[in-house]
Structure formats: structure tokens, C-alpha cells
């Protein structure tokens, strides 16, 4: 009783699957020569072994022909015919062969099958069939219902849908599907392109990946040379570059691997062709997918965070330190969201090999995965990023127009806005092209697949599409454009860090010099004192400019210089005296007789007051060094004791020579 129940459930499930994917079926006369002399003459297709017609069933029975011709068992031919061309008892009802019939055929022909190298298929295991009292359906049952009635057509032309060829079938444990059919995988090489086209595309992707890898690696190394140079709001550019550096690295690895990871090897002995790798059973393919998908999504999220930091700096006027306090939240979002999506795809077993680029990704053959895990995140990032970017640029432009700034700050602000605009365009244009390619691919995927089935149905011995109205093949340029724009997206980061300062940093790095701490020009625009006051002040409050001790023409004023000199502490005055002494000693030249003379005598004479040259006698020249040391020592003590001493103007050389002439 239990065996009958299991058999009934098995047949019901198979019929339910057929009714969901195909049209209604009908009884049809048996055309197989091997099954012509049986007590029944009509069968039901498709059968229990997923053969959609009798021609396909005949091809599947060919390996058993030697055993049937040698008559290893008189029950083998009835058993095969009952399984491959089952008797049609009623419309939509099939009768399974009995277990005893299967066991006798297997026991008597097993050794001969081993000799011919013919395996006993798993779907023909005797335990799957019911334990009948009679090994075969009774003739009475066959004669009553074997002839087709007027209500049941003998055969109709109908749409069978896609049936997976034997060459493309895979292990059921892999839980993969192709064109809606389980345990089936797409063929390798690619379904739509020739081998020479695939070879050209692979080299094209390899060259572009090297260019992108070089650009993003240069950006990252520039950041490592001077970590303090790139702070918020522009720090996300570095992480954005790191993401696309990893993306380009994975594509370069795929170029080196060719299709060794993206495709499963062929097995001619089991009639298995090379198929696309699907699922997480291939560890190398899984690793390539995880890194590629994770960093692709993380790169787009970091671009959104970059627009957020620009928005915070331009609209609410946040400073670099305030934005940097949110760095933990930025990192949690940029790495957490892609990580969650990657884990979900791993759990759903949506990994697919790409036999064009040699990597593994998602949505290459599954339109639903492409729509929800690739297109949706990218479109959301573009909408949010563009909105924040436009808001920030509009705010900065309003500052430039409404608030009066110095010409230098105006130029810096305009330059900063231009850099933001150019960088955003260089990112958005390739990304929008990639999204457009994905939308086009999603819209025409069904037409391409139908065309492929139409062209290969006779080769694979599967049913051809019924009433095909549109056929089309994809152009290789579409896929090349998609891969090109996907990699070019990472190159704009090098334009942001590319400047004269970067060249100086690399030159200093190669020469082993330590670079002085500086402020990046793009960040300095938002931190300029006058510019920051203009951003943070009340629009109705007038701007009060404070003097820094120098005029706009760059000339020193007497009042400001004197005031700054009077406010210096004693330590700075002592250092000033030391600098005077060292300056004078540096300007003296020692002659052969041991005397020290000024190096530029003519220049000193021109700078001295009228009549002062007459006091520079030979005696004063001999003792100038001695008096200089004594007067410098006395002057330094006198200066330290009187903090409000008068500071004379002129160069240190003039002051020292004037004092020497007076004492003489």
C-alpha cells in the first residue's frame, strides 16, 4: 500500500510540473520500432523520464539496444517500453512498470551491461516502482483503454517549452536552473558568441582592468604617502578608489584564469558538455563573486557617502572635524550594506560564472537576481547621490553669488566647484551607461534565449519553440561597453588626487625627504578664515576684515611691525640676537693674513649712510670681530633687561656695521 501511495505521489508531482510548464498532452500512437509488438499501441508524452516526444525517448534507449538484441532477458524490452513509452490508460493517466519486472531485467542483464559499459540509470532504480502482483498491466485494462477515443486527439502540435538537453544536465544537489528548468546549466563557451569574439572580449577586458588597476592603485598609494592630506569631506574618494581597485583586480584575475573557474569541465563519457558554473560548490568561483560583488556595491555606496560629506560641508556648514566624527557610521554603512547583500545571495545560491570575463557574478542568466540585486541598488545610489550633489553645488553657488569674498577665495571656490562637477560627471556617465546596458539586457534576454533555442533545438534533440515571432542575437559591442564602463568608473579618482602637490610628494618620497604638513587646497577652500566666516555669519551682519600685519599689496607697515616686535617674548629676542650674529659672521670673509672682511664690500657701501665709510679704518677692521662679539653680548643683555627696547629697522648687516663705525 505504501509503495502504491509513493508511486501515485511521484506521478502526480511529475504531471503537475509538466502542466505548469507546458501545454496539455494527449495519447499518441507508438512509433518506436522496439515497442511495436507489445500488447498496447498508444503512449503518453512526455514520459516519466522527461522525454518530450518519442524521438527523444528512442535516443535515450539506444544504449540498451545491444542487450535487447542479445536477449539477455525477455523482460528487458517490456520493461524499457513500459518506462520510455508508458501505456496510456486514460487521458492524463500513466501506469508504471512493476518492481518485479524491473528486478528480473536488472539481475539478468547486469553483467552484460557492465561488459558494454552501460550504467543502470538512477531513474530506473527498481525501488522506485510499485510492488505489483502482476509484473505488467493486464491485457484487459490495455484493450479497454488502449484505443484513442474521439475526444482524445492522437497528437497535437503544441508549445513544449524548454526541455533541458542531456548534455546540459547537472547534479541535482547543485540546485541550479536554466531557463526555468531545474538541474540544468547554460553551455560553455557563451551561448551567443563565437570563440574568436570571446577571445577578443577577454583581452579587451584584461587591458581595461590593468588601466583601472594602475589608476586606483596610484590613488591609494598617494594617500598612504601623506595620510593627513586627504581628510573629510574628501576622504571617501580614497575608499572609493580602493573598492574599484579590488574590482579591477578581480577582472584581471579572471582574464588570467580564462574560463577555468567560470565553466565546468566537459565529461564526454557521460555525455556531459561544458556548462556554466552555478551555485557555491566551486570555491574559487564563490571567492571571485564575493569580492567582485561586495566591492562593486561598496564603491557605489562610498560615492553616495562622498556626496553626503560634500552636502554636510556646503549646506549645514559642517567642519572637517564634525564630519570625521561620523566616520564610524559611514564605514558601517559602506561595508555593512554590501556585506548583507552578498550573504543573501550566497544563501540563495545565485552565483553564476561569466564565460566572457572569466569571473563570477550575479544576474548573468537570472533576470530576477539582476533586477533586485544589481539594478535596484545602483539606481538607488544614483538617485540619492545626484540629489545631494545638486543640493551642495547650489548652496556653494549661492555663497559665491550672495556673499562678498576676496578674489582669491572666489577663485578657489569656483575651482573647487568645477572639480566636484568634473569628478561627478566622470563617475555618473559610465555608471549610467552600465545601468542602461543592464536594462537593455533585461528587456531582450527572453528574445535572445528563444533565438538560441530555435538555432540549437535540433542539435540538442529538444523541442523547438512554437510560433516564434521575433528572433534576435545580442551584439558584442553591448557587452564590451558594459565591461568598459564598469571599470572606467574607478578611474576618476586619479583626477582628484592629480596635482602639482602630488608630484612633489612622489618626488620627495623617492628622494627620501620628509614632506612638511600642509592643507589640501580643496579642503582649504572650506576652511579659509574669511570664507568660513562668510559661511557661518548672519547674512544681515556686515563683514569686518581684520589686519594680519601685512597689507594686500604685501608691504610691511611700520606700526604693525613695531607692535609685533614689542609683544615678542624674551626668548624670541634672544634668538633674534643670535640670528644677527650668525648673519654677520656668514657675510664675512677671512683673508690670508687672518683678517675678516665683508664679502660684498661694494654692496655694503651702497647701503651705508653718507660718511660712514670714513670710520672703517684698518684698525677697526682688525678689531671688528672682537668688538662685534663684545657688543653683541652686551646688546643681548641690554635687550633682555629692557623688553620695550626700540627695534631699529634695516638689515642685520647694516645695524652691525653702523655700531662698529660709531664705536670707532
From Swiss-Prot:
Q: Name one GO cellular component term.
A: apical plasma membrane
- UniProt topology in membrane: Multi-pass membrane protein
Classification via CDD domains: 7tmF_FZD3, CRD_FZ3
Q: Tell me, in one coarse class, where this protein mainly resides.
A: membrane
According to the record, the segments passing through the membrane are 205-225, 237-257, 288-308, 328-348, 374-394, 420-440, 477-497
Outcome when changing residue 502 to V: Complete loss of activity to induce the Wnt target gene Siamois expression
- Cite the entry's keywords alphabetically: Cell membrane, Developmental protein, Disulfide bond, G-protein coupled receptor, Glycoprotein, Membrane, Neurogenesis, Receptor, Signal, Transducer, Transmembrane, Transmembrane helix, Wnt signaling pathway
Q: Where is the composition biased (Polar residues)?
A: 549-564, 573-585
**Cell compartment(s), UniProt:** Membrane; Cell membrane; Cell surface; Apical cell membrane
Q: Name one GO molecular function term.
A: Wnt-protein binding
Does Transport show up as a keyword for this record?
Answer: no
Q: Which residues lie on this side of the membrane: Extracellular?
A: 17-204, 258-287, 349-373, 441-476
Q: Name one GO biological process term.
A: nervous system development
Q: Which InterPro entries match?
A: Frizzled/SFRP (IPR015526), Frizzled/Smoothened_7TM (IPR000539), Frizzled_dom (IPR020067), Frizzled_dom_sf (IPR036790), FZ3_CRD (IPR041769), GPCR_2-like_7TM (IPR017981)
**Placement of sequence motif Lys-Thr-X-X-X-Trp motif, mediates interaction with the PDZ domain of Dvl family members:** 501-506
Domain of life the protein comes from: Eukaryota
- Show where the FZ domain sits: 22-135
Entry text on domains = Lys-Thr-X-X-X-Trp motif interacts with the PDZ domain of Dvl (Disheveled) family members and is involved in the activation of the Wnt/beta-catenin signaling pathway. The FZ domain is involved in binding with Wnt ligands.
Q: Which family does it belong to?
A: Belongs to the G-protein coupled receptor Fz/Smo family.
Identify the PANTHER family for this entry: FRIZZLED, FRIZZLED-3
What is this protein's record name? Frizzled-3
Organism expressing this protein natively: Xenopus laevis (African clawed frog)
Lineage start: Eukaryota, Metazoa, Chordata, Craniata, Vertebrata
Amino acid at each position: 500500500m505504501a509503495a502504491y501511495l509513493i508511486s501515485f505521489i511521484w506521478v502526480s508531482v511529475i504531471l503537475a510540473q509538466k502542466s505548469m510548464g507546458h501545454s496539455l498532452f494527449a495519447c499518441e500512437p507508438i512509433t518506436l520500432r522496439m515497442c511495436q509488438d507489445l500488447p498496447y499501441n498508444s503512449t503518453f508524452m512526455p514520459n516519466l523520464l522527461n522525454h518530450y516526444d518519442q524521438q527523444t525517448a528512442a535516443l535515450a534507449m539506444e544504449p540498451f539496444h545491444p542487450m535487447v538484441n542479445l536477449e539477455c532477458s525477455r523482460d528487458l524490452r517490456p520493461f524499457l517500453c513500459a518506462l520510455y513509452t508508458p501505456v496510456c490508460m486514460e487521458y492524463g493517466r500513466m501506469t508504471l512498470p512493476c518492481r518485479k519486472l524491473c528486478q528480473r531485467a536488472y539481475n539478468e542483464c547486469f553483467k552484460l551491461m557492465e561488459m558494454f559499459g552501460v550504467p543502470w540509470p538512477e531513474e530506473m532504480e527498481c525501488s522506485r516502482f510499485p510492488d505489483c502482483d502482476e509484473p505488467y498491466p493486464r491485457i484487459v485494462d490495455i484493450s479497454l483503454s488502449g484505443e484513442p477515443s474521439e475526444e482524445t486527439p492522437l497528437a497535437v502540435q503544441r508549445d513544449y517549452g524548454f526541455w533541458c538537453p542531456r548534455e546540459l544536465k547537472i547534479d541535482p544537489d547543485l540546485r541550479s536552473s536554466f531557463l526555468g528548468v531545474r538541474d540544468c546549466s547554460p553551455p560553455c563557451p557563451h551561448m551567443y558568441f563565437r570563440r574568436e569574439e570571446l577571445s577578443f572580449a577577454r583581452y579587451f577586458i584584461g587591458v581595461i582592468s590593468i588601466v583601472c588597476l594602475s589608476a586606483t592603485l596610484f590613488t591609494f598609494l598617494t594617500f598612504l604617502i601623506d595620510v593627513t592630506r586627504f581628510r573629510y569631506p574628501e576622504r571617501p574618494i580614497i575608499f572609493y578608489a580602493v573598492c574599484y581597485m579590488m574590482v579591477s583586480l578581480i577582472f584581471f584575475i579572471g582574464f588570467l584564469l580564462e574560463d577555468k573557474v567560470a565553466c565546468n569541465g566537459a565529461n564526454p563519457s557521460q555525455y556531459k558538455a561544458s556548462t556554466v558554473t552555478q551555485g557555491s560548490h566551486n570555491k574559487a568561483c564563490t571567492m571571485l563573486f564575493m569580492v567582485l560583488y561586495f566591492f562593486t556595491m561598496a564603491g557605489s555606496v562610498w560615492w553616495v557617502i562622498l556626496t553626503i560629506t560634500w552636502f554636510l560641508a556646503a549646506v549645514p556648514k559642517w567642519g572637517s572635524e564634525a564630519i570625521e566624527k561620523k566616520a564610524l557610521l559611514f564605514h558601517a554603512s559602506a561595508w555593512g550594506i554590501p556585506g548583507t547583500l552578498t550573504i543573501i545571495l550566497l544563501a540563495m545560491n545565485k552565483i553564476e560564472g561569466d564565460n566572457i570575463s572569466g569571473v563570477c557574478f550575479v544576474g548573468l542568466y537570472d533576470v530576477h537576481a539582476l533586477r533586485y540585486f544589481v539594478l535596484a541598488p545602483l539606481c538607488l545610489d544614483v538617485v540619492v547621490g545626484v540629489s545631494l550633489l545638486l543640493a551642495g553645488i547650489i548652496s556653494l553657488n549661492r555663497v559665491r553669488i550672495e556673499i562678498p569674498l576676496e578674489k582669491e577665495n572666489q577663485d578657489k571656490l569656483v575651482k573647487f566647484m568645477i572639480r566636484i562637477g568634473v569628478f561627478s560627471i566622470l563617475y555618473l556617465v559610465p555608471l549610467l551607461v552600465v545601468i542602461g546596458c543592464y536594462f537593455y539586457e533585461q528587456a531582450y534576454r527572453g528574445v535572445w534565449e528563444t533565438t538560441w533555442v530555435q538555432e540549437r533545438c535540433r542539435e540538442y534533440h529538444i523541442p523547438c519553440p512554437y510560433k516564434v515571432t521575433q528572433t534576435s542575437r545580442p551584439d558584442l559591442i553591448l557587452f564590451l561597453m558594459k565591461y568598459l564602463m564598469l571599470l572606467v568608473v574607478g578611474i576618476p579618482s586619479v583626477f582628484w588626487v592629480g596635482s602639482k602637490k602630488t608630484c612633489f610628494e612622489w618626488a620627495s618620497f623617492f628622494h627620501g625627504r620628509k614632506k612638511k604638513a600642509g592643507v589640501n587646497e580643496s579642503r582649504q577652500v572650506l576652511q579659509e578664515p574669511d570664507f568660513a566666516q562668510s559661511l557661518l555669519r548672519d547674512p544681515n551682519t556686515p563683514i569686518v576684515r581684520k589686519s594680519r600685519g601685512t597689507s594686500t599689496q604685501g608691504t610691511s607697515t611700520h606700526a604693525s611691525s613695531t607692535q609685533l616686535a614689542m609683544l615678542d617674548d624674551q626668548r624670541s629676542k634672544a634668538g633674534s640676537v643670535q640670528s644677527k650674529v650668525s648673519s654677520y659672521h656668514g657675510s664675512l670673509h677671512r683673508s690670508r693674513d687672518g683678517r675678516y672682511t665683508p664679502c660684498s664690500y661694494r654692496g655694503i657701501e651702497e647701503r651705508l649712510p653718507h660718511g660712514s665709510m670714513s670710520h672703517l679704518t684698518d684698525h677697526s677692521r682688525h678689531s671688528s670681530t672682537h668688538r662685534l662679539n663684545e657688543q653683541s653680548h652686551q646688546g643681548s643683555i641690554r635687550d633682555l633687561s629692557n623688553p620695550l627696547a626700540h627695534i631699529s629697522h634695516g638689515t642685520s648687516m647694516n645695524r652691525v656695521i653702523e655700531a662698529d663705525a660709531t664705536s670707532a
